[in-house]
UniProtKB/Swiss-Prot annotation:
This is Structural protein VP10. It is found in: Virion. Transmembrane segments: none annotated. The keyword Lyase does not apply. The gene is Segment-10. Coiled coil: none annotated. The keyword Ion transport does not apply. It comes from the Viruses. InterPro entries: Seadorna_Vp10. Keywords: Capsid protein, Virion. One of its GO terms (cellular component) is viral capsid. Forms the virion spike 'foot' and helps anchor the VP9 spike 'head' protein in the virion. Disulfide bonds: none annotated.
Amino acid sequence: MDVLSKSSLKELLAHLERTPLEEAISYKIGTIPYQNVLISRNEYYNQPYPDVTSLIDGVAREGQRNVNGLIMSIISYVVSGSGHYIPNIGYTLLRRSILDILTKHDTGLNTNNINYDMIARNLTVSKMNCEQRKRMLICFKLLAYKDGNLNDYETYLNQNISLKQIAPNFIPGDMRTVMSNSDKLSIVGIPAYRLTQSTELSIRDDNAKSYKIGYVDWYNSSSFLREGNDFNLISLKDRDNKYVRLNGW
């Protein structure tokens, strides 16, 4: 059963339609997610401007590695209000809206080879609450619909039954397909989500007992519970009509 309300989905999409990609990029070095990748020499040297590189491994910014990082940054912003560090992105692309990146083909980004499972794991999906996971799945659904990868999206859901049970059931571009049930899409506080990620990285990189004790103490504290923040789209402090009108939907 779909637990996403039509009004909250439209408000989320309207916000992303009016938010430039630049807002989803962190200019703080050190926030990029780590992932193991196999770098092809051809991918680097076949780029028109191989000296214009991005990320930490020297791959040209048009390469698949950077596309994955960019999509992860967008989804991180959508679920937590804070993106990752993605340098050397062209100004034109930075000014495109987040919704354009997720739904349109004229951005110059080839998102056809996105690995949903890898992105979800790198964003610590296991520590997201229900509403955060739904926001992530909304982004996946938009990308799958744009790229014609709905079969891959459905396969990912079938391999993750807990996500399939909460996956928003809608057709991008057609709000009539959304069931009108109550859901505020509220999310866990940004500091709490970030603390989850940083603590898990500490545990993974340095298996010290003190880290584990700190993690358990924090996990069992009230900080892990859902808390309000400025990114809750239902109660934006500067909320006005521009966040509830969605063009073309």
